[in-house]
Amino acid sequence: MDFLTTVESPALGLIPAAFAALLLLDWIRMSEAAVRGTDDAAPCYRPRRWSVSPAGALFPFLMLAAWALLPCVGLIATSIAAMLGCSAVAFLAGVIGLHRDAIREALLADTDASRGQRMFRHALLDLIVLAGVVAASFFAIEQPYNTTLACVQKPFLYIDVLLMALPVVVLYFLGQRRAAGPGVACVLYGVMGLAQYYLWRFKNTAILPADLWAAGTAAAVAGGYSYTLQDPALIGLACATMGVGLASLLGPDRRGKVDGKADAEPKPHTARDVIVNLACAAVTAACMVAAHVDPTYTQMGAKINYFWPLYTYRQHGAILSFVAGSQDLVIHKPSDYSDEKASSELKALVARYNKELAGDASRKAAESQFEGQKPSIVVVMNETFADMSIYDKMKSGYEGPKFFNTGMTDALSHGALSVSVNGGGTANTEFEFLTGNSMAFLGLGKYPYSIYDFSDCEALPKQLAKLGYASTAIHPNYPSNWNRKSTYEGMGFDQFLSIEDFPEDAPRFHNGLTDKVTYEKILELLRDNDEPQFVFDVTMQNHSDYNVGNIPADRLTDYQPEGISGDTNALLNEYLSCIQASDEDLEYFVGELKKLDRPVILVFFGDHQTNFASTYNDAWYKGESELAHNQRLYQTVYTMWANYDVAGNDQANVDDYTSPAYLAAMTLNAVGAPLSDYQKAELVARKTMPAINAFGYLGTDGKWYETDDEDSPMSGLAAELDDITYLRFARKLK
């Protein structure tokens, strides 16, 4: 039998079950000894029976019990060696918890020691134990996800450990120097490590501060993933369990002397003790706050690589990286900013629009047509819709979504869409489209939907309402996801149709209601109301994960790129099957729109690529600049199509690279609708800067430039857009 081979078998549970039984037997023995008052029990057990069952032993026992049960339901897949080692560690932690008083007695007992000597020994013991708790906590967080743990850079390692230690010390003093506070901290660190593990496995990314506001959304879509624990997670939990066991050794030395011997009965806390401990907690808490606020960790070199946050977390440590990310949540005012300056820059761009674009014959024709008939505007943001053929046809002849690429030759325009998220973060692409604001000027690491109030901010539904449009948002999932219910209200949508507005037996595919179900809802809106409609539909069926295994065999694609693992290619084919299904539903939808006796313009785009695309990108595209290499991962597709002849437009399916922040302005410009000053400025900016996302912008020379590149030929324009974004959005936030 190979003890190092990963296995998934109920028999694995026998190992932790045996250790749990041994721990329980020791627990029973100690309890009986305490009742009898025999020499088997430490002196401090005799007066208080409950002291033989501290939480320091309870938590390891519960952990062993969980490990014994989880293999029976397929939630642990690990090696025998790992299970044996982790179970032994948990058992040892439980033994420490059970015998904590005897251990402390052995370490601190000295009948001839003075009070000062006892205090010193006690303080030294607590210091050593706290160091052990912090060390266990560090490994509890890092081990589950950090495959390069030995490579954590030294300067950042020390800061990371310090940031981790401060909360432990605060809880130590708040708990009057007892075990509970540090023990709870260790458990919380273990939970964080487990969360990091799952996010690494599911999304190939790390937990960012903004994710805390999106926790409800994560929970709502959590059902599509496999939560099997493997070696890294199991070892991390074992470390957390040992931390709890070590923490049980903490406790104040509150004994006097009786007949020259240590008194077994602890003395009660005095008011002075409580005040001193609380004062120490307050001082440590102040240091903790200062450590989170005062140093600018980005300037110290701990800047997060938002292209790949996981890399930064592994190099700098999870806690330091998380704190650095929290400092990025603030939308910083641009340098040399003033409202007057930003307004002047906006007016200058509007003047350029009026001079260079407003008089265009095609625009004039579209304006005249719009005055006579306002087309309904339908926008579909399709979950994870992208054309993976950009990866050299996946080196297996993949041509991309067939109808999308070849079935709408009469579209107004189509092309690549440069988005700001990968593998998740759908709401940020939504935000960019509906507000026209690029994440490039808000800063990285934010989810605006989750943290801002949009009541006083400009948004497309409000703009179209002034033109007589009724607006509807559709998303076939929970309305609380990404805080959409409140956000859509703030943006001015008249109604929001969520999963609650669809039949329980509505057709499903992969991870949600089919795209077609939402399209039928849109068609119903268009048929039942003759007034111009603005409908924004966020689909769900293609949502990750892609190892669900629920695609019918006759609909499952079979592309096998060479040099890539079979597991990754299995993910690819489940994903491509979803894209194929979406493509078929899109063909149906376009066919139905053609039958309508009313003008409709359809804007269809993908929110982001799948997270595993990086496997192919890294394997096949080497030697590129980091920016150009990563931008491939942040590219989806869009099309703008109409079921009527748009005046002034050849409808020749022009290939036009763009971004979600520009797309609404492009749409309104194409159909002849009135434009806001900001949209006019965007259209002027597009002439120089065709595409922009959170990481950079594309020049007319075909090169990508980083957003903070002051030497780029577009740095001046980028600075102007930064000012204008702050003027019209950031300063209006509540």
Regions found by a protein language model. Give the residues of each.
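Generic structural signal of hydrophobic/aromatic residues within well-ordered alpha-helices
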Residues: 103, 136, 218, 319-322, ...
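Intrinsically disordered, low-complexity coil segments
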Residues: 33-45, 254-273, 340-341, 354-371, ...
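Transmembrane and membrane-interface helices of multi-pass
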Residues: 2-313
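Solvent-exposed soluble domains appended to multi-pass membrane proteins
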Residues: 351-371, 381-382, 386-734
